[in-house]
Amino acid sequence: MSAPITIDAPVATRPMPARTFWRRALRHRSFVLGGALSLLVLASALVSLVWTPWSPYEIDIAAKLRPPSAAHWLGTDSFGRDIVSLLLAGARSTIMVGVIAVSIGLTFGVTLGLIASARRGWTEEIIMRFSDFTFAFPAVLSAIMLAAVVGPGMVTSIVAIGIFQIPTLTRLTRGSANAIWAREFVLAARAAGKGRFRITIEHVLPNILSILIVQVTIQFALAILAEAALSYLGLGTQPPQPSWGRMLNDAQTLLFQSPMLAVYPGAAIAISVLGLNLLGDGLRDLLDPRLARER
């Protein structure tokens, strides 16, 4: 699931004017729908910072498993906590983990990929072998090893997911950058005496940004799935901090009695992942020069 998206070699073009981009974007159904779903999740997380219908941390056993009502719009869970409040606070936890984890993967992955492409030789070989080694440890396995050392928690899931993001972004960056290094304008820059670092910053990185932006949306979706899985297994976000994965864990023993307790967090995860994937598809179509000319 974490393999990089397939995009043809980057084409050096002038940046698309912002007005042209947004005019085309608002006509692209995948981009609009994906953006709307993603903004819905982001808005839920932001709202939870200042308001929730009830405290997501307050336990009221007397109110457990209540059906939807005017007081509790989606009912309550087995601890008497308001479902809407848990979903809002869970969105905050999920986005926090996803943003930090993807930032870790992006920082190290892009840096290593650019270095491998610029230096070549033994430097490239070492970086790519390190990438292969890291790729052998999925997020769940990394979280288990980290939990054995420092204990389970949000930090454990962030580090584990972040490490798992690195090899994918390293490979994508290196492959995309190699295509740019072979182009005439880069060869001309080298002939003019520009160093590898300057060429990387001025020519290579700007020409692969669109590919990286699209891939980040895919990696963010994978991070949400990984965070939910780790929290469900008890390795990620710990009580009393709400998490969609933790909500699924709490609901598994009540599937026949109250199946909606599992449906709500499952739907939240599905909406988040679907929105990011649609957004990524839309950005790919809008930012790829070949696809842009075809539309």
Please report, for each region that a protein language model flagged, where it lies by residue.
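Transmembrane alpha-helical segments of polytopic membrane transport and secretion proteins
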Residues: 1-39, 278-295
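Transmembrane alpha-helix signature in integral membrane proteins
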Residues: 35, 83-115
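Membrane-water interface segments at the C-terminal ends of transmembrane alpha-helices
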Residues: 36-55, 90, 129-152, 162, ...
